[in-house]
């Protein structure tokens, strides 16, 4: 711009804000600094923040136009240079006070980034240096020289992408060596005196004599030296190479510049060399690169491209060239403006990224480490997006990426770059994100195996306080995550403390280090730090152990309670953990929590030691009598483990053995196995004498024969007696007066033993009935003995269940989200998982009579009674107490908690019997077996035939429904043949106070309904529209939905009306129309409120009945397509439309309900398969004009009729091929042209097959009603319109393969033909005066048209 500017003193100094008065697109934000040459400000634009550089014009003769053209050309040349950011706009103010340059704002330049935390590591510096050379190479190959490369003009984004900006071709190429004024004016904008200019640009001052003469004598005319300069020499590539070398050197010396102005001038003359600064560059290849780039002779400097090739694999890793540069360049494009998109792209490419950056097939380890370090560049992209992510899925994807990359990152990156963002996410508004952030933080910190000096206090001062609030988070899922990870967090914090302590001791013991830096020394000594850490963790552990949600407590116990014991030490493990855990057994409603206690108590007891056995003994005994059999199993397993570890004293062991021995006949298989496991472990721990003297007496009642190797599980299991029958056990356990039952059973046992002469029947009728029921279920004397052996357990369990019931009544048992199946009387269905042995038919036949008592009522109902209905009297009768089943019930081997419910179908047998080895009573005579067996089969066959008949009826119903669907009519009352409305106004209805949005007619044409922006829905009687009454009013008005009612529809075959409002409400109304013409009633039946942020309001709705479902389909503005099953009040299906193709404006459903089509605001028409809920195809209008209304074609199943924005266009599209088959064009514009001189559009469509001759009625913004005869287009006409409308004719032509019916205005008024009916008198303005919003027809004694308009008017025509 000439060197003369340096000497001009401004006549007036204005603030930079004052120059924004004439700029309308930019709003001043803040000043970025000012110099004599430029005033720099940041401004707001609709596309983002921009930098505005203002040049105050002091000399109006300056040739600014040429500079503006040069900058425009430079912008075009650098369009494809991804590392260059030229000025996007150059403007001169109208008042000619200033010239302004505009470019995108980038927050950080390289000078600021070098001194900003987190500091750049070596690989990031190499990456930035690589990009600087790449940017210079891109500019030079585009024919552009920069002229002012310095750290202030190298912009660095938050993801370390370099942008070379502020191209200074307008600044002077050459500067006088003896006068620093020009340098200060043009290049030293930072006032640091740092010089990046190539030495050859400083020339002898004689060539600037003209300027000096002017400064001495102001009367001398000023000469613009710029043109002369350009003829003498322009900017050379070598000049930019020198400047780039200075920038790279400053990057690798932590901000120490190579030259200031005086040093550069001395270097130019050979009196100075920056060796001292260059030696600070540790990397030899980088030092050699810089040395070559700052050669004093320009000819010795290479091109930027040559340096890139030369340093490939040396200063710059190979992966920069092969992967990082092309991959990262895609994020610099405008298509990736969203942080969410960047994260999703990286997650999609993660496998490829890991393969390229962390491949394990490298020949040398050093190269592998170099490639792995390239992940740091990728991490900067991820972290730059974290704070601006919008969707929950994107945030979770980012956390997933961090977790995948963390094991391959260095400690510094994990602590300095990753951890702060994870703590930021721990304060996110979405609970899922907070929970996942905590999990990710825990796993990332667990990877740190060494602690840097500056991070010695990161846990107590940063991490633990940063997540402390999560222990009291409102969301249970977050507290769950805290409970799940607090043990690992505490373990990692302790390891950090120990690593810091070890490092401190090593530093103190080194002879060369007399003093330890106070900044890196941990606060206080080790014991003090450990005590503080214990207190911080203890506070959160106690909070979690006292959480109101049991699942949080359970999670804490199941995830590292033993590690917390190690962290706290023995004393605190006993005082803090064990004392809180004991209280969990008081919760009688949550057996999962009690079970988790016994799962985790072994680890705690093992750490606390055998001293805890006296405390745990009553707790373990309580677990052995728990009401839930799962808890008993867990208590048995805990006792077994504690016995193996020697944590139980010998007297306690024998006491537990006495309590556990009766479990050997418990009906639950898992409990029996648990009891066997404990007995065998005890046998291992004690001597042989103790086994036979103390242990065997407990076992004798439950084994069939003496056993020697009692410590072997298989041996003990093989000699166990048969367990108590599950049905008998459960029935006895559920009895209210179980104590009286056991007293009577004890008396019966004494009588059998001979110690009691007689056992009178029980006096209590309830006990007598109970005993009779037990005997009828097969209770034998042996079963009675086993029940008595389990007496203590059953009494305690009965009391525990009673207490649990009482406690559930005291507390609110109907907890939110908890369904009590027992309270609902629902019985779980079970099958035995033990495979039964196949037996010969005659054996199975013999057992049928005896097994009937064990089969439940449902089995009998399904397959018939096992006992024939008419048993011959010759069969011997046996008493109840003699009848013992030969097979075992499935519940004899499993409890309700253990068995897996395989099916809820009644066909699944609940009595998969396992035959007994020894029958207890003789079988019946073989003479009656064949008939008994035959009768059972006949009963089963009858049930099977009934099932087959039921299935046949169901199949017939489905076939009829299918036929109904195939024979579905387009409309129940079509217009009469040859119907051509005359356009006579029958009724003018003005009850609505705002725009009417939709009209719908009921199936039998008895009613029609309108909805309006005034919030009302009005029901009209069609019979009163024939003009026979003097006044016509609506028969019903409904206004309780709120908001503006946008759409409505009648349900097929009913007087149910569905309506939707813009406040998100959708309601189903019932209309009692059986009393017409009397006033009917209306009442809401169902309703739902849509999420305005997630779904938005409803834009269109339809109803169809598929036989099995009555579906109300509605589309929302945010792209949701929902099928609401009105019979089950749930969604039959939900589809999600991609909003990239536009917002949904309308949709239509195929008459056979096989597919639907949606229209969008961008002209797209997308088809969905209703059977599989999958998108089929999508076609777009050539002009991408908005689809205003969609309708199915009445004759062609694959066609849709679409009303398009502009030119009154209505087109018929074959969605199977995507072809536009027929277009109705009521516009003066050339048919099918994309220009729209006519803004009018069709807003309402009515189509009818009309007995094979389809007709179409349209109405819209031109306030005309048109009748289109699709068979004979020339017979189409305007039914009703504004007064004085010119007459029109219709012609059919073929344009580009599409049939077009065009409306053409007649030049002269032609009388109506015989076929065209006359409209009403021309003088009566009967037409609408505002946009017609919808049109419909109904049939009474004749055909009628009903229209509605934006001014709230409803008109009826015939």
From Swiss-Prot:
This is Phosphoinositide 3-kinase regulatory subunit 4. GO terms for cellular component: autophagosome; axoneme; ciliary basal body; intercellular bridge; late endosome; nucleus-vacuole junction; phosphatidylinositol 3-kinase complex, class III; phosphatidylinositol 3-kinase complex, class III, type I. The gene is Pik3r4. One of its GO terms (molecular function) is protein serine/threonine kinase activity. Myristoylated. It is a lipid-anchor. GO terms for biological process: autophagosome maturation; cellular response to glucose starvation; early endosome to late endosome transport; late endosome to vacuole transport; pexophagy; phosphatidylinositol 3-kinase/protein kinase B signal transduction; phosphatidylinositol-3-phosphate biosynthetic process; protein targeting to vacuole. ATP binds at residues 32-40, 53. HEAT repeats lie at residues 413-450, 458-495, 572-610, 612-648. The lineage of its organism: Eukaryota, Metazoa, Chordata, Craniata, Vertebrata. Residues 1315-1326 have a biased composition (Basic and acidic residues).
């Amino acid at each position: 711009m000439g060197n003369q500017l340096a000497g001009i003193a401004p006549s007036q100094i204005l603030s930079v804000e004052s120059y924004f008065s004439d700029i309308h697109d930019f709003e001043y934000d803040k000043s970025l600094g000012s110099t004599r040459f430029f005033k720099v400000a940041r401004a707001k634009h609709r596309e983002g923040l921009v930098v505005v550089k203002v040049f105050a014009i002091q000399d109006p003769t300056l040739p600014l136009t040429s500079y503006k053209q040069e900058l425009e050309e430079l912008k075009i040349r650098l369009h494809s240079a991804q590392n260059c950011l030229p000025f996007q706009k150059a403007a001169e103010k109208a008042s000619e006070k200033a010239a302004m340059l505009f470019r995108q704002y980038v927050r950080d330049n390289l000078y600021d980034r070098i001194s900003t935390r987190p500091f750049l590591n070596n690989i990031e510096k190499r990456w930035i240096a690589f990009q600087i050379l790449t940017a210079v190479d891109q500019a030079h190959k585009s024919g552009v020289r920069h002229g002012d490369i310095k750290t202030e003009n190298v912009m660095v984004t938050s993801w370390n992408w370099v942008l070379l900006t502020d191209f200074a071709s307008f600044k002077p190429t050459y500067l006088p060596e003896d006068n620093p004024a020009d340098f200060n004016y043009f290049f030293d904008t930072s006032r640091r005196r740092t010089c990046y200019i190539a030495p050859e640009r400083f020339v002898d001052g004689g060539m600037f004599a003209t300027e000096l003469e002017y400064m001495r004598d102001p009367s001398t005319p000023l000469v613009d030296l710029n043109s002369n300069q350009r003829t003498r020499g322009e900017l050379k590539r070598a000049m930019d190479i020198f400047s780039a070398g200075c920038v790279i050197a400053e990057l690798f010396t932590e901000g120490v510049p190579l030259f200031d102005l005086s040093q550069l001038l001395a270097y130019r003359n050979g009196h100075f060399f920056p060796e001292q600064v260059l030696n600070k560059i540790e990397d030899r290849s980088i030092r050699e690169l810089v040395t070559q780039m700052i050669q004093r002779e320009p000819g010795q400097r290479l091109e930027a491209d040559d340096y890139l090739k030369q340093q490939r694999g040396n200063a710059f890793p190979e992966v920069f060239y092969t992967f990082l540069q092309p991959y990262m360049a895609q994020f610099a494009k405008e298509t990736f403006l969203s942080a969410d998109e960047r994260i999703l792209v990286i997650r999609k490419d993660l496998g490829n990224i890991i393969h390229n950056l962390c491949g394990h097939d490298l020949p040398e380890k050093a190269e592998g480490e170099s490639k792995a370090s390239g992940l740091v560049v990728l991490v900067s992209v991820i972290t730059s997006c974290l704070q601006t992510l919008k969707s929950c899925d994107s945030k979770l994807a980012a956390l997933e990426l961090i977790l995948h990359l963390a094991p391959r990152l260095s400690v510094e990156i994990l602590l300095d770059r990753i951890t702060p963002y994870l703590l930021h996410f721990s304060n996110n508004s979405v609970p899922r994100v907070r929970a996942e952030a905590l999990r990710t933080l825990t796993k990332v910190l667990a990877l740190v195996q060494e602690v840097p000096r500056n991070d010695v206090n990161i846990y107590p001062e940063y991490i633990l306080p940063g997540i402390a609030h999560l222990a009291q988070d409102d969301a249970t899922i977050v507290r769950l995550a805290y409970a799940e990870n607090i043990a690992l967090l505490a373990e990692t914090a302790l390891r950090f403390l120990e690593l810091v302590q070890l490092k401190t001791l090593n530093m103190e013991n080194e002879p060369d280090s007399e003093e330890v830096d106070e900044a890196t020394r941990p606060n206080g000594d080790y014991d003090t730090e450990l005590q503080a850490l214990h207190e911080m963790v203890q506070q959160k552990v106690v909070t979690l152990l006292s959480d109101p949600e049991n699942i949080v407590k359970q999670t804490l116990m199941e995830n590292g309670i033993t590690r917390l014991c190690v962290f706290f030490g023995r004393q605190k493990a006993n005082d803090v953990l064990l004392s809180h855990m004991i209280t969990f057994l008081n919760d009688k409603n949550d057996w999962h929590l009690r079970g988790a206690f016994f799962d985790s108590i072994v680890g705690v007891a093992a750490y606390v030691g055998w001293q805890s056995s006296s405390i745990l003994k009553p707790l373990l005994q309580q677990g052995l009598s728990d009401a839930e059999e799962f808890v008993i199993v867990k208590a048995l397993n805990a006792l077994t483990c504690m016995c193996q570890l020697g944590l139980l004293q010998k007297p306690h062991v024998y006491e537990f053995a006495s309590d556990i021995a009766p479990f050997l006949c418990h009906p639950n298989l898992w409990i029996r196995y648990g009891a066997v496991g404990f007995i065998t472990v005890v046998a291992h721990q004690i001597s042989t004498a103790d086994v036979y003297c103390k242990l065997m007496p407990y076992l004798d009642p439950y084994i069939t024969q003496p056993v020697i190797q009692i410590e072997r599980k298989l041996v003990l299991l093989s000699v166990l007696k048969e367990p108590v029958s599950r049905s008998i056990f459960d029935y006895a356990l559920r009895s209210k007066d179980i104590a009286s039952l056991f007293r009577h059973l004890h008396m019966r046992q004494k009588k059998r033993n001979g110690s009691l002469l007689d056992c009178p029947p029980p006096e209590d009728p309830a006990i007598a009935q109970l005993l009779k029921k037990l005997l009828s279920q097969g209770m034998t004397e042996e079963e009675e003995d086993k029940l008595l052996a389990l007496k203590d357990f059953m009494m305690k369990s009965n009391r525990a269940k009673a207490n649990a019931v009482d406690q559930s009544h005291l507390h609110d048992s109907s907890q939110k989200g908890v369904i009590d199946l027992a309270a609902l009387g629902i019985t779980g269905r079970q099958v035995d998982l033990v495979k039964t042995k196949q037996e010969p038919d005659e054996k199975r036949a013999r057992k049928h009579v005896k097994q009937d008592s064990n089969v439940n009522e449902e089995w009998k109902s399904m397959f018939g009674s096992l006992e024939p209905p008419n048993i011959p009297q010759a069969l011997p009768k046996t008493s109840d107490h003699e009848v013992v089943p030969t097979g075992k019930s499935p519940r004899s081997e499993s409890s309700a908690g253990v068995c897996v419910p395989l099916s809820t179908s009644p066909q699944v047998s609940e009595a998969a019997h396992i035959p007994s080895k020894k029958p207890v009573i003789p079988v019946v005579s073989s003479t009656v077996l064949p008939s008994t067996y035959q009768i059972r089969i006949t009963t089963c066959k009858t049930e099977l035939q009934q099932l087959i008949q039921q299935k046949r009826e169901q199949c017939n119903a489905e076939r009829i429904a299918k036929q109904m669907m195939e024979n579905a009519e387009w409309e129940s009352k079509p217009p009469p043949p040859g119907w051509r409305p005359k356009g006579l106004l029958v009724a003018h209805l003005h009850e609505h106070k705002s725009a009417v949005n939709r009209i719908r007619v009921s199936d039998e044409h008895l009613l029609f309904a309108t909805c309006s922006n005034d919030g009302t829905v009005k029901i009209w009687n069609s019979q009163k529209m024939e003009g026979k009454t003097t006044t016509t009013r609506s028969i019903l008005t409904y206004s309780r939905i709120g908001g503006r009612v946008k759409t409505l529809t009648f349900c097929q075959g009913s007087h149910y009306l569905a309506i939707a409002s813009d406040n998100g409400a959708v309601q189903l109304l019932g209309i009692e129309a059986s009393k017409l013409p009397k006033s009917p009633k209306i009442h809401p039946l169902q309703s739902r409120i849509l999420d305005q942020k997630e779904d938005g309001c409803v834009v269109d709705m339809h109803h169809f009945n598929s036989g099995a479902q009555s579906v109300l389909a509605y589309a929302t503005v945010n792209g949701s397509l929902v099928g609401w099953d009105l019979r089950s009040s749930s969604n039959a299906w939900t589809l999600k439309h991609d909003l990239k193709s536009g917002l949904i404006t309308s949709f239509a459903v195929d008459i056979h309900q096989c597919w639907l089509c949606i229209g969008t605001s961008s002209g797209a028409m997308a088809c969905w398969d209703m059977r599989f809920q999958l998108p089929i195809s999508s076609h777009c209008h050539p002009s991408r004009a908005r689809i205003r209304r969609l309708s199915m074609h009445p004759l062609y199943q694959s066609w849709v009729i679409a009303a398009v924005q502009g030119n009154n266009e209505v087109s018929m599209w074959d969605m199977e091929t995507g072809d536009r088959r027929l277009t109705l064009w009521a516009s003066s514009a050339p048919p099918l042209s994309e220009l729209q001189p006519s803004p009018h559009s069709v807003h309402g469509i009515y189509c009818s097959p009309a007995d094979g001759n389809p007709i179409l009625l349209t109405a819209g913004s031109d306030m005309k009603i048109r009748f289109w005869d699709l068979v004979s287009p020339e017979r189409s006409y305007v039914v009703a319109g504004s007064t004085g409308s010119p007459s029109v004719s219709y012609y059919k032509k073929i344009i580009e393969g599409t049939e077009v019916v065009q409306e053409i205005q007649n030049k002269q008024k032609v009388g109506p033909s015989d076929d065209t009916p006359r409209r009403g008198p021309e003088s009566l303005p009967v037409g609408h005066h505002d946009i017609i919003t919808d049109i419909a027809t109904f049939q009474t004694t004749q055909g009628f048209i009903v229209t509605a308009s934006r001014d709230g008017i409803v008109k009826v025509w015939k």
